[in-house]
Amino acid sequence: MNDLMRDLAPISAKAWAEIETEARGTLTVTLAARKVVDFKGPLGWDASSVSLGRTEALAEEPKAAGSAAVVTVRKRAVQPLIELCVPFTLKRAELEAIARGASDADLDPVIEAARAIAIAEDRAVFHGFAAGGITGIGEASAEHALDLPADLADFPGVLVRALAVLRDRGVDGPYALVLGRTVYQQLMETTTPGGYPVLQHVRRLFEGPLIWAPGVDGAMLISQRGGDFELTVGRDFSIGYHDHDAQSVHLYLQESMTFRCLGPEAAVPLRGLSQAATKA
């Protein structure tokens, strides 16, 4: 038994498999950052930080008794991992139904928890999480951000400018276009005055993937050349057991992670109108 304590849960192997399948499917669809940044891990639950390769000189120095020698001290810089955890509750009646062969058990709480933790990870990567010591891509690359047009029929022109920004900085492709929920939906619905789908025009401008990212505000054009953005995971998404009563089983979905922007020049944030107003 490990710290997840799954062996203590009154859940059959078949029900556990169904729970894992639902969680995995939702995570696969919802997660966007892992499709465009470098992934390091999983390093394990005991991984606590990432070495930054730098040190800080300390003003206070330990004294060597009986010696005139000077002892210098430097503290190594690290970036700590943060823990993300989403609790959820399943009805025992539904879990028992799975064991009896039901294929329509209510596992919506699993889906909701997986969606929540996936969006939390993506927001930390794309928009940062100051309390956790994480600078997001949008923050690190804000100097060269572009504003999305009020009419997304003009989106291809903005994309051309964003591609030019990356190439002018010597950033090679392939490139990926990460689209927030609203931008993605509007691009799907927008056509040019001649009736041509804007999304098809966008796809002709570059060969990279268009990625739906519900955790992103606006959009981002990101190089996938590698080495610029690093997501480090200690424990990858895991489901653990908390407790249970006669009616319910209380579980949680957990991971530990951090993120570093090593080459902020490799992304161009495309801000929505509300974001542009905030930055002005």
From Swiss-Prot:
Swiss-Prot/TrEMBL keywords: Encapsulin nanocompartment, Ion transport, Iron, Iron storage, Iron transport, Transport
Localization terms from the record: Encapsulin nanocompartment
A Pfam family recorded for this sequence: Linocin_M18
Protein name: Type 1 encapsulin shell protein
Family: Belongs to the encapsulin family. Family 1 subfamily.
Function: Shell component of a type 1 encapsulin nanocompartment. Assembles into proteinaceous icosahedral shells 24 nm in diameter in the presence and absence of its ferritin cargo protein. The center of cargo-loaded nanocompartments is loaded with iron. The empty encapsulin nanocompartment sequesters about 2200 Fe ions while the cargo-loaded nanocompartment can maximally sequester about 4150 Fe ions. Does not have any detectable ferroxidase activity.
GO terms, biological process: intracellular iron ion homeostasis; iron ion transport
InterPro entries: ENCAP, Encapsulin_nc
Disulfide bonding pattern of the chain: none
Gene Ontology, cellular component aspect: encapsulin nanocompartment
Keyword check for Ion transport: yes
Oligomeric and partner information: This encapsulin nanocompartment is formed by 60 subunits; monomers form pentamers which assemble to form shells. There are 12 pores where the pentamers meet as well as 3-fold axis channels and dimer channels; none are larger than 3-4 Angstroms in diameter. The N-terminus of the protein is inside the shell, the C-terminus is outside.
Provenance organism: Rhodospirillum rubrum (strain ATCC 11170 / ATH 1.1.1 / DSM 467 / LMG 4362 / NCIMB 8255 / S1)
PANTHER family: PEPTIDASE U56 FAMILY, TYPE 1 ENCAPSULIN SHELL PROTEIN
